[in-house]
Amino acid sequence: MPKTTMPDRFWTKVDTSGECWIWLAHIDAQGYGRFGQEYAHRFSYELHRGMRPIPTGHQIDHICHNRACVNPKHLRAVTNKQNGENRKGPNRNSTSGVRGVTWNKRHQKWCAKFRHNGAYIYVGMFDSLNEAEKRVIARRNQVFTCNTKDRRKRKV
């Protein structure tokens, strides 16, 4: 009886019916699929590139923000900084619900700023949350290279 290959075993654990290819086997506490001792998305990335290893100093970014997705079209090798640029949204403790926008009590305005290379980039103070959001997104798009979420058309 022929031995089952790693790719054959991998494909029995993937649902390819949607845009995101969902890992059906073990999912860890952080939401990532596990394939033996390896992350499923990392195995998928390497498998679809002829088993070439992920470049040194890089990690795999889920462009779709779905940690269980193993679709190679949704995966890219990026640096830690680039992966941080493509964050899904605001911090858990955000009071505005908008990434990079906070309420300034002293000035009674929305303050838009974000971090880049260890320093804050100040965008401005705004009367409306909507205007602050538009301006911080526009400025991040000028500075960041891997923030696909900001570059998608916003639904109004």
Question: Which role does the model predict for each range below?
Answer:
Residues 36-118, 137:
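Short, cationic Gly/His-enriched loop motifs
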Residues 1-36, 64-65:
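Short helix-coil boundary/hinge micro-motifs
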Residues 129-140:
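J-domain helical core
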Residues 119-130:
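A short, exposed loop/beta-hairpin motif centered on an aromatic-Gly-Thr core
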Residues 18, 25, 31-33, 97-100, ...:
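Glycine-centered flexibility sites
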Residues 81-82, 142-156:
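Extended, polar beta-sheet/loop recognition surfaces of beta-rich domains
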